[in-house]
A protein has these predicted regions:
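Surface-exposed loop/turn motifs in large extracellular/passenger domains
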Residues: 1-258
Length: 258
């Protein structure tokens, strides 16, 4: 898929799982190119009832994508929802072509989810490979309905490489119960992720968490049981948390902010 002259898309899309303004599922061999002199721009609304929903791509496994500006008024789904990419699972490595970046542009727009929502990327994991015979659903993380704890898929292996997200800018508002971040909602525990020179929000931008989103079903409004998340490392008692951050909602030890 590519653009040579006018790299602009506008639509109102509805679906279930794997819904995106450009592609619902972008596999590891796919190529999205833009040879015009203008940034790829997506506008409209993307509304879905399921998982992996993004303003540009629902589920991405490709290692390279073009720069993009997402100017949608709404991106909504159940889990793994991002202003640009819902679930980013590139194979081997991940770059934005020509040193570019992803930006979301409408300050009055919003990203809505029950869990795992990011202004740019909902969920991020660098895969070593995409095993044959494994379904797309099996590659996605699961969330325990009782504890709210997110568990990365064991049907694929995490790559040893590093993902660097540089100069990304989010202007969309975020509405979710748990795992919500201005740039990334949640990063896989083993994926080495560096986020540098990222910007989240304008004066109009607000982070809404903890079951405050009137459009979702409040599936995780009780938050994440922190003791279950921490294992034996800390004792939080019966405390729950939303896991929300201006840049990343759930930052693992392999996550670096610069």
């Amino acid at each position: 898929m590519g653009w040579e002259r006018t790299p602009t898309l506008g639509a109102i899309l509805y679906g279930n799982n794997y819904v995106g303004g450009v592609a619902g599922y972008n596999d590891e061999k796919a190529t999205i190119s833009n040879t015009s002199t203008k940034n790829l721009t997506i506008s409209g609304q993307i509304v879905a009832a399921g998982k992996a929903v993004g303003g540009m791509i629902g589920l991405n496994c490709a290692s390279t994508l073009p720069s993009a500006t997402v100017a949608v008024s709404r991106v909504a789904g159940q889990q793994l929802v991002g202003g640009v990419i819902g679930a980013n699972l590139p194979v081997g490595n991940f770059t934005v072509a020509d040193g570019g970046a992803f930006n979301t542009y409408v300050a009055s727009g919003r990203v809505e989810a029950d869990a795992v929502a990011g202004g740019i990327i909902g969920y991020n994991r660098l895969l070593a490979d995409k095993p044959a015979g494994v379904t797309l659903a099996a590659l996605l993380p699961t969330i325990d309905k009782r504890t709210g704890v997110l568990t990365d898929s064991t049907d694929a292996q995490t790559a040893d490489g590093e993902v660097t997200l540089a100069n990304f800018q989010n202007m969309l508002n975020l509405q979710a119960d748990i795992y919500v971040g201005g740039i990334v909602g949640a990063n896989d525990a083993k994926t080495k992720l560096t986020i540098q020179k990222a910007t989240n929000g304008a004066t109009q931008n607000a982070l809404s968490v903890g079951g405050l989103n009137p459009s979702n079903n409040g599936a995780f409004k009780g938050g994440v049981l922190l003791n279950e998340l921490a294992g034996d490392r800390y004792d939080f008692g019966t405390a729950h948390g939303a896991l929300a951050g201006g840049i990343i909602g759930y930052a693992t030890p392999n996550t670096v902010l610069k």
